[in-house]
């Protein structure tokens, strides 16, 4: 009997999957691969059903002969192992980023003469409703809040992009790329105080109050499912910080990052060019501990941002603070630098990891932007935040468009640079 292989990466079995099985049975015994959690995150979305439950769900489908684990988005390794006569899939993988997966399958099958079968993709109102329900569940606070911790345990490095509106949230949520035969997407979103302030036309001095910043979070949460890390600046007074923690936790935010400075906020990238005062270790530890005590769940993370390298206080001071902050209850450490060379960041990570192998390390490579995610992960970094790139890329484009319209007294000259209106309409889905 010939063997037919297909792979499912779903939390719910619907008529589309059953149609695949029905077609596959015409060609032979059906083997279904269940995509692992780690691979599912890179390819599709965070699973809402455990891997074990997904395996059981597929096992119970009539007509399935065997169920195996597929550990990678690409099929070449599982095809090499199983050598199926056929691989069957919906024809939606003929275009877009998924085409890379199909090309990978074709290449693997060619080695021994296997065949690929494309069946019409099933997407009707019933399937759309199922997808919508899954998205709604992923967006619920109790599911979203804990997802950052889960991702840290699953991913080599959690890729985080800055967002400051519902629209930028959609970009972070929906952008998937194919490069060098692999698919990738962002794992989490960063609500930056700099970018939030800039979008509102305000200076980055903690002028925008928490009520306004919470509205930004609401706008983003309304249209996304990915976990959110909140830029809490200094955290403010300890007496105020505990209320911020409680509010963010209730909303479903996954983490807050607070920096160990006091007084009027100045952006860290100014370094010693402006007066910036670093908080005492004792006082900042008290703030961290107070925040941890007020939490109602273990899901929410308080991450301590160390400014010692920014303020040229030295590596020893940075490490001393890191270990003290962890002892006070910090769930993670963010180390920052304004140097283009990442050497001091990597030195800190290596020295910290010698004594602490478990506490997550966060970096923001705005200045030292030549280093890759893989290199950071090799030095023990768990979360990388691209903290302002969407804002910084949008402003020059909008400014140039405004200038050209004024220059030519019409909009024709800018049209080639504009996103088609139909693409904007399709980006924002109706309920």
Regions found by a protein language model. Give the residues of each.
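Alpha/beta enzyme core
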Residues: 141-366, 370-385, 393, 400
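Extended, intrinsically disordered, low-complexity segments
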Residues: 136-148, 167, 389-431
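Hydrophobic packing residues within well-ordered alpha-helices of enzyme cores
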Residues: 58, 79, 130, 172, ...
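Flexible loop residues that form catalytic
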Residues: 35, 72, 92, 194, ...
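Nucleotidyltransferase catalytic core that binds NTPs
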Residues: 1-141
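Short, basic, helix/turn surface patches
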Residues: 60-62, 91-104, 115-121, 216-222, ...
């Amino acid at each position: 009997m010939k063997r037919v292989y297909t792979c499912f990466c779903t939390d719910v079995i619907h008529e589309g999957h059953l149609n695949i099985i029905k077609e596959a049975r015409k060609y032979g015994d059906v083997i279904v691969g269940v995509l692992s959690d780690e691979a599912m995150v890179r390819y599709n979305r965070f699973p809402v059903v455990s891997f074990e439950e997904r395996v059981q769900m597929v096992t119970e489908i009539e007509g399935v002969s065997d169920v195996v684990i597929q550990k990678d988005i690409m099929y070449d390794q599982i095809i090499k192992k199983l050598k199926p006569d056929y691989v069957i899939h919906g024809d939606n993988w003929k275009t877009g980023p998924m085409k890379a997966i199909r090309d990978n399958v074709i290449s693997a099958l060619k080695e021994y003469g296997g065949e690929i079968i494309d069946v019409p993709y099933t997407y009707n109102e019933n399937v759309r409703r199922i997808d919508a329900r899954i998205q709604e569940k992923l967006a619920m606070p109790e599911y979203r809040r804990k997802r950052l911790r889960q991702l840290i345990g699953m991913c080599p490095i959690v890729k985080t992009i800055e967002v400051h509106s519902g629209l930028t949230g959609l970009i972070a949520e929906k952008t998937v790329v194919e490069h060098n035969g692999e698919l990738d997407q962002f794992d989490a979103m960063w609500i930056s105080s700099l970018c939030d302030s800039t979008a509102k036309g305000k200076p980055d001095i903690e002028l925008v109050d928490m009520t306004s910043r919470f509205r930004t979070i609401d706008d983003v949460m309304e249209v996304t499912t990915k976990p959110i890390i909140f830029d809490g600046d200094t955290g403010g007074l300890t007496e105020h910080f505990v209320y911020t923690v409680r509010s963010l936790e209730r909303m479903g935010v996954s983490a807050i990052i607070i920096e160990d400075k006091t007084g009027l906020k100045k952006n860290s990238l100014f370094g010693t060019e402006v007066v910036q005062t670093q908080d005492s270790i004792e006082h900042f530890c008290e703030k961290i501990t107070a925040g941890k005590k007020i939490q109602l769940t273990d899901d929410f993370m308080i991450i301590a941002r160390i400014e010692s390298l920014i303020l040229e206080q030295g590596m020893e001071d940075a490490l001393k603070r890191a270990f003290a902050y962890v002892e006070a209850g910090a769930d993670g450490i963010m180390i920052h630098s304004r140097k283009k060379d990442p050497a001091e960041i990597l030195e800190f990570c290596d020295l910290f990891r010698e004594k602490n192998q478990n506490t997550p390390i966060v970096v923001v490579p705005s200045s030292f932007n030549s280093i890759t995610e893989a290199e950071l992960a090799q030095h023990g970094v768990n979360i990388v935040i691209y903290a302002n790139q969407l804002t910084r890329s949008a402003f020059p484009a909008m400014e140039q468009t405004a200038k050209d319209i004024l220059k030519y007294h019409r909009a024709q000259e800018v049209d080639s640079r504009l996103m088609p209106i139909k693409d904007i309409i399709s980006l924002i889905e109706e309920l």
